[in-house]
Amino acid sequence: MKLLAINGSPNKRNTLFLLEVIAEEVKKLGHEAEIIHLKDYEIKECKGCDACLKGDCSQKDDIYKVLEKMQEADAIVIGTPTYFGNVTGIVKNLIDRSRMARMGNYRLRNRVFAPVVTSGLRNGGAEYAAMSLIVYALGQAMLPVSIVENPITTGTFPVGVIQGDAGWRSVKKDEIAINSAKALAKRIVEVAEATKNLRES
């Protein structure tokens, strides 16, 4: 089983930390995990030309490199901080530009999927950003999963919050987010193994 974790933050701080927790847990379970940073790829905004209705995107940039990695993975996690209650611009470019994968016979179908979100504020729109990613996954015929461990010590999916009771903190201090990241890794492996035949057919 191979996990691709996509860091949709322009920085390598809180979102990356949670992705690293997930990747390390997946490796401990005997599987492969890779983290990529969207900021290292040139993915321009969608032009709305609809070339992808008949074939590949008309813009020849790094979207092809990222989609290739996504297609090679059994499971995909997209991590994003919340920017005004939604995903970052570079994540939205990935979402829009990967339309050709959907139009090209659902090339990402049956990949296990989960969102990871970080937010500056406790009520900073993390759940809305996560839902945007889940809707994207459903549109690509992926298989979104949630955490199935103790709902008191974990969330439905990892949400790291920088705003603490005593002021600002690092997500590294958010125990619920860390517990959730570890639990999500286990769930991803479980579902990926159970659905392996779907990706091989």
From Swiss-Prot:
Note on how the cofactor is bound: Binds 1 FMN per subunit. Binds 1 [4Fe-4S] cluster per subunit.
InterPro entries assigned to the protein according to its UniProt record, in alphabetical order: Flavoprotein-like_sf, FMN_Rdtase-like_dom, ISF_SsuE-like
Presence of keyword Coiled coil: no
Residue sites binding [4Fe-4S] cluster per the record: 46, 49, 52, 57
Cofactor needs: FMN; [4Fe-4S] cluster
Alphabetized GO MF terms: 4 iron, 4 sulfur cluster binding; metal ion binding; oxidoreductase activity
Keywords, comma-separated and alphabetical: 4Fe-4S, Flavoprotein, FMN, Iron, Iron-sulfur, Metal-binding
Pfam families: FMN_red
Keyword presence, Transport: no
PANTHER family from the UniProt entry: IRON-SULFUR FLAVOPROTEIN MJ1083, NAD(P)H-DEPENDENT FMN-CONTAINING OXIDOREDUCTASE YWQN-RELATED
Function: Redox-active protein probably involved in electron transport.
Subunit (UniProt): Homodimer.
Family: Belongs to the SsuE family. Isf subfamily.
Protein name: Iron-sulfur flavoprotein AF_1896
The species this protein was found in: Archaeoglobus fulgidus (strain ATCC 49558 / DSM 4304 / JCM 9628 / NBRC 100126 / VC-16)
